[in-house]
Amino acid sequence: MPDPGWAARTPEANDLLLKAGTGVGTHLANQTAWTTLGASHHASGVASAINTAATAASWLGVGSAASALNVTMLNATLHGLAGWVDVKPAVVSTAIAAFETANAAMRPAPECMVNRDEWGVDNAINPSVLWTLTPRIVSLDVEYFGVMWPNNAAVGATYGGVLAALAESLAIPPPVATMGASPAAPAQAAAAVGQAAAEAAAGCGMRSAYQGVQAGSTGAGQSTSAGENFGNQLSTFMQPMQAVMQAAPQALQAPSGLMQAPMSAMQPLQSMVGMFANPGALGMGGAAPGASAASAAGGISAAATEVGAGGGGAALGGGGMPATSFTRPVSAFESGTSGRPVGLRPSGALGADVVRAPTTTVGGTPIGGMPVGHAAGGHRGSHGKSEQAATVRVVDDRR
């Protein structure tokens, strides 16, 4: 639609409006682009036609004929698109020519401004010269309003009309492309678009769910940390009570330590008394029969009786200390009358009673603090222990 403002604007305003743009530079760039695109479409159509003609001889069957038909239709559509593009450079060329014509036909804005300036000066000095400038003022008005204004308005309107027509030519849509070899291509494209939209929605849902789970995990972690902090504070509060409970057994152990100190001090004295009470420790060969009997019987009363029979020596440390005695070890040889059948002992074989010397007890002088032992065989009484001589059995297997 042409601009209706051409007739309403002043001549200088229309001229400035037409020349205020970029001129024909953008028109020329657009014309070159359309020309290049049309040439490309023509070249593609020609190349496709040559390829079809070269390979159609090797196509067989109904499918080959359908393919050749589709290629021909596509090439025709491409050439139709190239023809639609070929019109555009001519349209742009017409617009360039219209702009140049309008630019040349327009009365320049400086000329229009000079007319108006002179008209104003003449009107200012006309009374002083007795209105002798009135004819000049009228001619200036006729030139401005009768020539400049109508001219520029007409040129602008004409140029606007040409551009409106060219715009309608440019608005013609391109030819519709024919269906290709795959009729299901549009449906597949629509399905692909739908699938992409569904995947995008699913991705957004998964991200939202992950963010929710992450937020929940963060809250749970904070709750767990709070519980751990409370447990640490509780254990810190219980530490003084545990220290008090540990100090109580240590305080109870102090009296027992005081009781153990005198006993530890008495241990060297007890060791010394035990040394004097053992005759064998001082090199004495004999031991008191009464003490031996007391050790064998294990009775406290028997030990007291034998100690009284031995001479009543004084004991250090009181009457509760038992006498030390020596017990003869058991013989390693069995007796000859053990009940098992044995052979006759040959003459000349030695028995245990011949080999073993009689055991004697050597009496000694009493030592202070130790009872005196009796001689061997003295005062054995009913507490004596009968001894049986051990024999050695020798079996001669040489016969």
UniProtKB/Swiss-Prot annotation:
Residues 375-399 are annotated as: Disordered. Belongs to the mycobacterial PPE family. The gene is PPE69. This is Uncharacterized PPE family protein PPE69. It holds the Pfam family PPE. The lineage of its organism: Bacteria, Bacillati, Actinomycetota, Actinomycetes, Mycobacteriales. Coiled coil: none annotated.
